[in-house]
């Protein structure tokens, strides 16, 4: 799972747990999609949020976004990675679509202007997925934006050569859809 959160003066004021689905056929946990809300129980999600707050405290991360990747084993979360930033998978946009909290805007307003954006999460009743448009490296991009999606973006134009980054399956764009 992934936890995307936000801290103000050491307090975790926002936390959302998402299911992080990776390609099973490739090494290294190459991400395929994120799903909100998590399919794990509320108890597991609460443990993830508490562990995120504890990790932030121990690492002295006090203000701004926090991203934590965790593995769940027997209903118990274990940290894989913690970093004081927005995640690298455009989760801020999925979170904005899902519960009307804009972590990107909140980060800029708070960290640059020292102003805290007021927010009140209002999760929609739908499960949403952020799904990456992926292709093999060095192939010619064949994808296109999904007009049925809530949001869709391609990093390449049709026919562009897909750059090799991980050598297995490269991100070429993403869509946000209802499941």
Question: What residue ranges belong to the model's regions?
Answer:
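Residue-level signal for secondary-structure boundary sites
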Residues: 11-13, 23-25, 88-90, 138-141
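Pocket-edge structural micro-motifs
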Residues: 16-19, 81, 135
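Internal nucleotide-binding/catalytic subdomain
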Residues: 1-74
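A broad structural signal for short, well-ordered beta-strand segments within beta-sheet-rich domains
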Residues: 12-14, 30-32, 79, 139-145, ...
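A short beta-strand motif that forms the metal-chelation/ATP-contact edge
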Residues: 5, 76-86
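A short, glycine/Asx- and small/polar-enriched loop/turn
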Residues: 72-78, 169-171
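Peripheral (often C-terminal) accessory segments that flank ATP-dependent C-N-forming ligase machineries
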Residues: 106-179
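Active-site "cap" helix and flanking loop/linker of ATP-utilizing ligase/carboxylase catalytic domains
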Residues: 46-68, 83-138
